[in-house]
């Protein structure tokens, strides 16, 4: 004789609730949501970048206006390292995060060396840079 499922004894309504809860719990396994950055805080943090960078003009580093969505090594008038010029990486939020985490690992041979170790700081800086698209 076949034994009935313990879930069947709960009734259809409760079964659907359990099924929905299970699907919700398992759909988020392995996925981490990145918190949205705070552009206002990012602007304050960006002051630390201004030894080398500017939003509007090239300096020791290339200008950052329009960096989100731009391809690496393409700012007119900036003298890139061969590594950065040849990388041809599109500066998505994800790639900017990797670059800020460890510039030398992300593009070996790049001129940039400064690391931003705090994930919240990186998110805030990227939010600030997104406000300066073009």
What are these regions (language model features)?
Residues 92-134:
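C-terminal capping alpha-helices of c-type cytochrome domains
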Residues 2-18:
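Bacterial N-terminal signal peptides that target proteins for export
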Residues 39-43, 54, 58-93:
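Gly/Gly-Pro-rich "capping" loops immediately C-terminal to redox-active cysteine motifs
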Residues 49-52:
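Short cysteine clusters
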Residues 15-27:
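Bacterial N-terminal signal peptides
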Residues 26-45:
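Electrostatic cytochrome c docking/interface patches
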């Amino acid at each position: 004789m076949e034994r009935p499922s313990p879930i069947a004894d709960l009734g259809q309504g409760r079964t659907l609730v359990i099924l929905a809860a299970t699907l919700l719990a398992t759909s988020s396994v392995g996925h981490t949501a990145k918190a949205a950055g705070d552009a206002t805080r990012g602007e304050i943090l960006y002051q630390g970048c201004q030894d080398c960078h500017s939003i509007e003009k090239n300096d020791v580093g290339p200008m950052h206006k329009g960096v989100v969505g731009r391809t690496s090594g393409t700012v007119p008038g900036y003298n890139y390292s061969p590594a950065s010029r040849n990388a041809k990486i599109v500066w998505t939020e994800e790639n900017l995060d990797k670059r800020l985490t460890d510039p030398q690992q992300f593009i070996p041979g790049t001129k940039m060396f400064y690391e931003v170790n705090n994930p919240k700081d990186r998110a805030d800086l990227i939010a600030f840079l997104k406000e300066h698209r073009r």
